[in-house]
């Protein structure tokens, strides 16, 4: 038995929700370790759909769910998401949900700054494509050592000084942007009004997880977004504001790296991306439209359409290395049904030279051209397949080619949005 880290191996939206739900039924503890409420996913349990963005997926199954210190927590969204789950009959109490006392808070001033910057960048043609939910500015305050954290809400005697320090920074920014300043009283009221809703869930998460590990609990670390959006290893600056690679599961939860275990990379059978940034295999033709339409490629949280393209083995192979992926869960294979031929990117051409990696340079990333191999497609349906024998021969060939090119085996194969439509090759908890 081992613990499991689940991450997206591409730019997010790989289908983590279904796989995490499948695994969470077998887990004892589910942990969020990075990001905020900027990446949503939908779980379908007994025919009921649950849309989550901040809360761990294990809540819908009554499992102990933990929001780690690596997550930035919007208290207003937290309350709204909890209330929505309760309205759907899910019990959300401190018995099943814990929040790290050292998790930073996202406040209204962070959302304001995020939106203002994105608007300014849009006007200058340099926008990143953020969700405008304050994630980036909240992480900036964390790194700048001025963030207000969950535990600060429990110490009213020291909170005023922390508010002053935060406002000194933000009001200087607002003055420079021609905006009115935020008053001490307004921010103090915002914080005190949410304290009673957050503090009952506060805990020393690092200690809790260590105790659970020693007791033999199966711990599932639930990553958000994708490794190619990692602040260090992604397509910088078109990335998120946190680390999304598997190593962050340790830093963002307080449980040491030796406890992480199996790393499962959720990998879509083609490639999608939301927002701005390089996308070497992007398709603007009828195939791209097919992938978008059949794959229903629209963001759960934002409603933004996703850009679509062929499978990029170069990128996933790189993620396998940077995240130490043990095996992948290949999703949305059924979206490829009916295509006459399929292409897989096996390398890039940069200024006339062939390379087998994505360069770090933003300019070089924009210039790379994909090198493809072409495989025969299949006409049969793979929808609902639950064993290898149900798959067309060409579909199996496609899967084997992906394994060979990325240097990692397929541990799970998803053939529809339904959780039961999954071919299990290797149980990550037993891996």
Swiss-Prot record:
Any one biological process term the GO annotation gives: 'de novo' AMP biosynthetic process
Give the enzyme's main class according to its UniProt record, as a single word: ligase
How are cofactors bound according to the entry's free-text note?
A: Binds 1 Mg(2+) ion per subunit.
Source organism of the structure: Rhizobium rhizogenes (strain K84 / ATCC BAA-868) (Agrobacterium radiobacter)
Q: What is the catalytic activity of this protein?
A: IMP + L-aspartate + GTP = N(6)-(1,2-dicarboxyethyl)-AMP + GDP + phosphate + 2 H(+)
Q: What is the lineage of its organism?
A: Bacteria, Pseudomonadati, Pseudomonadota, Alphaproteobacteria, Hyphomicrobiales
Residues bound to substrate are 300-306
The protein, known as: Adenylosuccinate synthetase
Where does this protein hold IMP? Answer: 13-16, 38-41, 131, 145, 225, 240, 304
Which amino acids does the record list as binding Mg(2+)?
A: 13, 40
Q: Which SMART domains match?
A: Adenylsucc_synt (SM00788)
Q: What does this protein do?
A: Plays an important role in the de novo pathway of purine nucleotide biosynthesis. Catalyzes the first committed step in the biosynthesis of AMP from IMP.
Q: Which domain of life is it from?
A: Bacteria
Name one matching Pfam family: Adenylsucc_synt
């Amino acid at each position: 038995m081992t613990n499991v880290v689940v991450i997206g191996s591409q730019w997010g939206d790989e289908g983590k929700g279904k796989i995490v739900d499948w695994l969470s039924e077998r887990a004892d503890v589910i942990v969020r370790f990075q990001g905020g409420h900027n990446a949503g996913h939908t779980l379908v349990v007994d025919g009921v759909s649950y849309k989550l963005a901040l809360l761990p997926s294990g809540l819908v199954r009554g499992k102990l769910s933990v929001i780690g210190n690596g997550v930035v927590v919007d208290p207003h969204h937290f309350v709204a998401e909890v209330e929505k789950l309760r309205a759907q009959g899910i019990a959300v109490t401190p018995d099943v949900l814990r929040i790290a006392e050292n998790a930073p808070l996202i406040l209204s001033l962070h959302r304001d700054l995020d939106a203002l910057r994105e608007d300014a960048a849009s006007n200058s043609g340099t926008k990143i494509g953020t969700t405008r939910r304050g994630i980036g500015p909240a992480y900036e305050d964390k790194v700048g050592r001025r963030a207000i954290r969950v535990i600060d809400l429990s110490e009213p005697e020291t909170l005023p000084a922390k508010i002053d320090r935060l406002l000194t920074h933000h009001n200087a920014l607002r003055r420079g942007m021609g905006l009115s300043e935020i008053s001490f009283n307004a921010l103090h009221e915002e914080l005190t009004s949410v304290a009673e809703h957050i503090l009952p869930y506060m805990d020393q998460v690092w200690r809790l997880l260590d105790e659970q590990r020693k007791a033999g609990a199966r711990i599932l670390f639930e990553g958000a977004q994708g490794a190619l959006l990692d602040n260090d290893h992604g397509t910088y600056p078109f990335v998120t504001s946190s680390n999304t690679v598997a190593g962050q599961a340790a830093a963002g939860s307080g449980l040491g790296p030796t406890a992480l275990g199996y790393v499962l990379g959720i990998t879509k059978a083609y490639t999608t991306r939301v927002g701005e940034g390089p996308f070497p295999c992007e398709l603007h033709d009828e195939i791209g439209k097919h992938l978008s339409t059949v794959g229903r490629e629209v963001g759960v949280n934002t409603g933004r359409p996703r850009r679509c393209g062929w499978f990029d083995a170069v990128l996933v192979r790189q993620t396998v290395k940077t995240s130490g992926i043990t095996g992948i869960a290949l999703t949305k294979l059924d979206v490829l049904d009916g295509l006459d031929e399929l292409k897989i990117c096996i390398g890039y051409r940069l200024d006339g030279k062939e390379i087998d990696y994505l360069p770090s340079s933003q300019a070089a990333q924009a210039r790379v051209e994909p090198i493809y191999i072409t495989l025969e497609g299949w006409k049969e349906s793979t929808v609902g397949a639950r064993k290898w024998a149900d798959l067309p021969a060409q579909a199996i060939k496609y899967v084997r080619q992906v394994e060979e090119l990325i240097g990692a085996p397929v541990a799970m194969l998803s053939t529809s949005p339904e959780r039961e439509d999954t071919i299990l090759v290797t149980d990550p908890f037993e891996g």
